[in-house]
């Protein structure tokens, strides 16, 4: 799937968008072993729920334990981040409840990454740091100084970055790879855009470029951009009609408060079940056509600051707020950005690409390349994958075998039946490590093993050419918009599937119910 736009382009953008955060995601909290309760005659043989809670276990996720210490430390980080964003911090119990939900999902994702054999080594972290520093026009040393000045240790930042890269690779494999946009869908989308000239600007993007750390400038023209935040009241799979009705009532109560004027970000932080709850519900900015149809119908005609009605999806009840919108010259601005040393903002779902219309033909240097991909897994380590490719490279350079034959025999990419042939590759079509290695090759030269988020590659450049890609860029942009439209619900479905298949014993929740019953 090396030429799969939705996986390659999105992975590239996500890794580069890992910014110099002043705070850390909740995964930065270090797990601490639970302390056993001291033995004594005054203790019952089987502790009551409240005593189990005091013992130090906040939740059990499959076979993993989340401790109270983890929850407390992560809550401190979340509280600091909310304050920096200007969002009211929920009361301690509510904050810990939200934080624990986040930790549970992070633990489930981590377990899934372990199962799939996804690992991130020090070299990959260094590579990401160099890219982030380059994008922000600073040296890695200056970047480290800024990070430490914010009160975060360099070791904490590296761990956070490693976790982010690993989770991004997991989501790419588990979610993005399953979103397939057909040529027929692209054709239909472009025809629809022709009937709506204002929206059609969204697909007239400039030629793909290497990512550059350019500050956003006010655009003179562009498509409608929409910045959304949400409050999600999740409806678990298998909920009874009474449970669904109770959750709807809860969502309606939150909607009434939002319509009345209560701060939306604070409501989201305290009540939303969405993965972006502790960012005030902020989902980021995209062209209008990049949002799911349900969201566009509910919020597409609203003005900035307005709140939608209740939106029901397969995951539950959504309340949407239009944080900002722009088009025809006004750039969309993120609401309440967290202070950070770098000019970028974190987002689970990245903003769409540049939308300025090109003037005249769009000419780029295309590379005709082929590759052999060896993926890492529980039975194929990084060292083993690299060594296998080194052995193949030696045989290729000795002239004993042909590249296409080795690709058919060994490559684990979908291009293997075609001898690893990627066709003509535009700038930006592949992830940065792959593209950098490919650009350094002369025609007919074979690279050493190259590490990317997909695994290890051997790359051979066959030829290069200058080519007008105006039509291709428009189709690529349309495909990306269609992908982004599906990404949000697909990600939420995947999270719900992870949760529904897991054993989760939430002791915080049990403790709260016990106290309510005793009142």
Curated annotation (Swiss-Prot):
Residues 31-50, 196-221, 328-361 are annotated as: Disordered. InterPro entries: OMP_Chaperone_SurA, PPIase_dom_sf, PPIase_PpiC, PPIase_SurA, SurA_N, Trigger_fact/SurA_dom_sf. Residues 223-324, 364-463 form the PpiC domain. Disulfide bonds: none annotated. Its EC number is 5.2.1.8. It comes from the Bacteria. GO terms for biological process: Gram-negative-bacterium-type cell outer membrane assembly; protein folding; protein stabilization. Keywords: Chaperone, Isomerase, Periplasm, Repeat, Rotamase, Signal. Gene3D superfamilies: 3.10.50.40, Porin chaperone SurA, peptide-binding domain (1.10.4030.10). Residues 31-45, 197-207 have a biased composition (Low complexity). Residues 1-31 form the signal peptide. SUPFAM superfamilies: FKBP-like, Triger factor/SurA peptide-binding domain-like. GO terms for molecular function: peptide binding; peptidyl-prolyl cis-trans isomerase activity; unfolded protein binding. One of its GO terms (cellular component) is outer membrane-bounded periplasmic space. Pfam families: Rotamase, Rotamase_3, SurA_N. It is found in: Periplasm. It catalyses: [protein]-peptidylproline (omega=180) = [protein]-peptidylproline (omega=0). The keyword Isomerase applies. Chaperone involved in the correct folding and assembly of outer membrane proteins. Recognizes specific patterns of aromatic residues and the orientation of their side chains, which are found more frequently in integral outer membrane proteins. May act in both early periplasmic and late outer membrane-associated steps of protein maturation. PANTHER family: CHAPERONE SURA. The PPIase activity resides only in the second parvulin domain. The N-terminal region and the C-terminal tail are necessary and sufficient for the chaperone activity of SurA. The PPIase activity is dispensable for SurA to function as a chaperone. The N-terminal region and the C-terminal tail are also required for porin recognition. This is Chaperone SurA.
